[in-house]
């Protein structure tokens, strides 16, 4: 299945957009359903192999999921791949600096189902993500442009 890809122009520098879009402690500010998140870094600053933990409210419970950072090239590219749970996300964030000092943000998202997730991903999860992703990046844009 093709990734869900959304893009948006943000009137902030690439550095600001990248820092905000890849900080799991800020995900709850712009991603529907996220209630918390943090990085588990080995050396204080993010690097490939570190763990990104985000907690989403699903159904009647808060469920953490862990991803590994697979690419980290600030302020241009960040990728994570889910490593636990029945639904594992693969996320690629790309930020391009524009000549006017704004930034073009692209987020590509794919899911891999394990166990029950094999049924949920094509039936429910992908459809919901296609609906939410444009709203999420619009919220990110509004938050960055309105509060900085």
Label each PLM-derived region with a short phrase:
Residues 1-42:
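Hydrophobic ligand-binding cavity/cleft-lining segments
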Residues 3-5, 62-66, 88-92:
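Short, surface-exposed coil-to-beta transition loops
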Residues 7-11, 38, 68, 94, ...:
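Generic structural detector for well-ordered beta-strands
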Residues 11, 72-73, 98:
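A short, compositionally biased micro-patch
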Residues 15-18, 134, 138:
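Amphipathic alpha-helical segments that line or abut small-molecule/effector binding pockets
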Residues 38-86, 104, 116, 135-148:
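Glycine-rich portal/gate segments that line the openings of hydrophobic small-molecule binding cavities
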Residues 81-135:
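Beta-strand/loop substructures that line and gate deep hydrophobic ligand-binding cavities in soluble
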